[in-house]
């Protein structure tokens, strides 16, 4: 199944983090990929401590999209493509032997919803994936192919504002988080532990 959390409201990443913790608590694997988040977000500190969770993120700081040079855009595109390829490799490793290279966590295999192949439960989070897709900072063919070939044993969560039509069409769950009020309207900056 595919989940999409979009909109201008706060909480899209928080929803994805909650789902990741729930899956890890149930003994499943989690691949949590974060795109276009500049500063270290505090949620990654706890996710990295969970042995069932693999966190993938571009570690280099590129700044805001409108401040990136053409060289920066080319570099971050390559790094985003590497993350997508690594996600595919991790899913294949988990499907084939019940563990990923990085984590070595055994989980009980279970039948997928169609009963075709036995494989462990996997949750893949593509946090803020809408931005690189909309701004051509990722090979969209990789993303589209991944959506089409998502194994039945996996759940996929996508977050970000302004999702593309194919993301909406592919989703089984779609929630649009709408901002009604936010402290930044009063000049209050983002606070650690709350917004990041």
What are the residue ranges of the model-derived segments?
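Phosphate-binding/switch region of NTP-binding enzymes
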Residues: 163-196
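Short, glycine/charged-enriched secondary-structure capping and boundary segments
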Residues: 18-19, 45-48, 70, 138-142, ...
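Conserved nucleotide-binding/hydrolysis micro-motifs of P-loop NTPases
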Residues: 37-39, 61-62, 130-131, 162-165, ...
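Conserved P-loop
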Residues: 2-93
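Residue-level preference for the first positions of well-ordered beta-strands
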Residues: 1-4, 29, 121-123, 155
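Structural signal for conserved beta-strand scaffold positions within catalytic alpha/beta enzyme cores
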Residues: 55-57, 158, 175-176
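Structural recognition of the conserved hydrophobic beta-strand(s) that form the central parallel beta-sheet
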Residues: 126, 155-160
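Phosphate-binding/switch loop-helix module in NTP-utilizing enzymes
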Residues: 68-152
